Amino acid sequence: MLENISKSEFVNFLLEKKHNIEPKTLPILEQHIREQKLDDFFLDFSIDFTDEELNNFLSKLDYWLKNTKLNSSKADVIFGLLYSCNKFIKLIKNPTFSFVEIKQFYNDILNTNKNYIIEYNKKDKGKINIAVEGNVVTRFPPEPSGFLHIGHIKAALLNDLMAKNGKLLIRFDDTNPIKEEKMYENVIIEDLHTLGIKNYTIVRSSDHFDSLYNYAIQLIQLGLAYCDNTDQLQMREERTKGIPSKNRNTDIETNLSIFSKMSSGNCLDYCLRAKIDYTNLNKALRDPVIYRHIEKEHNITKNKYKIYPTYDFACPIIDSLDGVTLALRTNEYRDRNEQYYWFLEKLNLPNKPKIYDFSRLNFENTVLSKRQMKFYVDNHFVSGWDDPRLSTLRGILRLGMDIDTLKEYIINQGSSQKSSVISWDKVWSLNKKNIDHKSARYSAIPKLYCVECLILDKNNNEIITKTEDIPKFKKNLSLGNKTIIKSSHILISQEDANILNNNEEFTLMNWGNMKVKEKQIVNGIIIKIILEENLAGDVKTTKNKLTWVNKENIIEFKILEYDTLQNDKNTDNLAEKFNTNSKKEEIWLGEKALISVSPKTYIQIERIGFFICDKPLEFILIPYTKQKRMR
């Protein structure tokens, strides 16, 4: 079974605190399932279930819960299993979730364990508790196959932070030429600069391809690696069940001969596997593949190699050769730590970096899969890797996230190993607070069904046109001034017009009080309102305070509002999963001062929300800033 390591650690914590059950080593959940003597189908659980597989598992579980009496410790193990699966967490929040027994069971246990979850998550949040000595050498190893996303940013910032008095390596993991493109190296470097990471040395995994090949031969000569032509599905089944490969005991000379042929582009059905322990409870040690054939020209080495090392094999060796002293990685791969040190020890490499693993950032309703994002980019569901619906750094910034806010939030999460799903509203709330002071204020209304207002004085004459300079934001005068024109012909929104009653006195913001004299309505749509100016009126006494634009001093512009990339459909079909309502566009009318707003500038449209200028006269609504209409 494949488990979420950090969530599994919580199960250890819960069972020890609540039931005095001794914590388990990896695989944690599997050992608890066996100790509690739960049915075998629980061992089929995986955090990487497809939608169909998860549905099948939940069907079995729902029936099982109906017909089984549970003690508290067994219930907590099952709860921990479900709690560790982000796909399940998202699914159970959906109102259409159909497994009644599971919903009742999970919510009951969740409420019971709420304080334990809070205690666990608070243990080291916000702290950087990584003990290191001397000059630290860290590495950030992105694969050049896409843009940096929110999941990469924490790793990049922590590596940079820990290397402040040492050395940071940006190592491009180019061990799979099928996925990699040179252009991605450039955009990753640009993204790192955006994050303020500028002191580093660039290296590549391919710098060590010759050494890695020789180390693979060394493992064969030590009897610690063998060539295997077992097909992929059978190999997966054998590793799952702890069955040795038919080729596991092939003699050294035969393995050396086959490996040599592999390197020449022959024996294409073979791979090289490390000979570790095919029955180990930690399945990462069950003879992992360390070399395989890839028929694709490499960006750097061109056609020199026909076979390439896997990341799991290359990573510890290159870390050692590059002088890395601290290897930071997300704890979902903690089961590979033992494998990491096995390679270093068997190859007698003197530099053994210290591994420190931390929890990855998981956000609600956020796609972090590079494969899925690439599908939406390649098939033009989105405009590119910087589309505001994507969780790439560029997409998030384009949606209106302030870079300093993002860095502040991530660093404040610390090096915690506790995994949790973060709600975006917390980050965007902090973002709103940080951009408020630098956001100039403007007035605007939707163009559709906008309402013309004629303003008269007490003698029923059109008022005299007045021009006035006012601050763009009264609380930050450094943003400068803008000019507003007060004349007899203005526009307000249909929504605002609908709330006004005849003879009502209300306030036009940045102007004064007005009295409704007449409303002209055609087919239920207000087309015109006659107002009487009453500047002597007290703005404190009016219920409605509305925004307006001058009819002769306006500019058309576009507002874009983005939603989540995917819908709630229970399907693995990415096209069907795409949220077709994830982008909305509207034409608005605003004061002409908006024409001078440059891209990447923050503004507030009063009584509407905060926006970021995407391009001239195009503004993106920043999430969680849409305001309730102030009456």
Swiss-Prot record:
Coarsely, its chief localization is cytoplasm
Q: What GO biological process terms are annotated to this protein in UniProt? A: glutamyl-tRNA aminoacylation
Which residues are recorded as binding ATP?
H149, E332, V367, L368, S369, K370, R371
Short sequence motif named 'KMSKS' region, residue ranges: 367-371
Spell out the subcellular localization from the entry: Cytoplasm
Annotated L-glutamate binding lies at R139, F140, P141, D173, Y311, D312, F313, A314, C315, R329
Q: Where do the TM regions start and end? A: none
Say which enzyme class the record assigns. ligase
- Output the Gene Ontology terms for molecular function: ATP binding; glutamate-tRNA ligase activity; sequence-specific mRNA binding
The UniProt annotation puts motif 'HIGH' region at: 144-153
Q: What is its EC number?
A: 6.1.1.17
Could you list this entry's UniProt keywords, alphabetically sorted.
Answer: Aminoacyl-tRNA synthetase, ATP-binding, Cytoplasm, Ligase, Nucleotide-binding, Protein biosynthesis
What InterPro entries does the record tag this protein with? aa-tRNA-synth_I_CS, Gln/Glu-tRNA_Ligase, Glu-tRNA-synth_arc/euk, Glu/Gln-tRNA-synth, Glu/Gln-tRNA-synth_Ib_cat-dom, Glu/Gln-tRNA-synth_Ib_codon-bd, Glu_tRNA_lig_a-bdl, Ribosomal_bL25/Gln-tRNA_synth
Is Cytoplasm among this UniProt entry's keywords?
yes
Nucleotide-binding as a keyword of this entry, yes or no, is: yes
Catalytic activity annotation? tRNA(Glu) + L-glutamate + ATP = L-glutamyl-tRNA(Glu) + AMP + diphosphate
Q: Which family does it belong to?
A: Belongs to the class-I aminoacyl-tRNA synthetase family. Glutamate--tRNA ligase type 2 subfamily.
Protein's name in the database: Probable glutamate--tRNA ligase, cytoplasmic
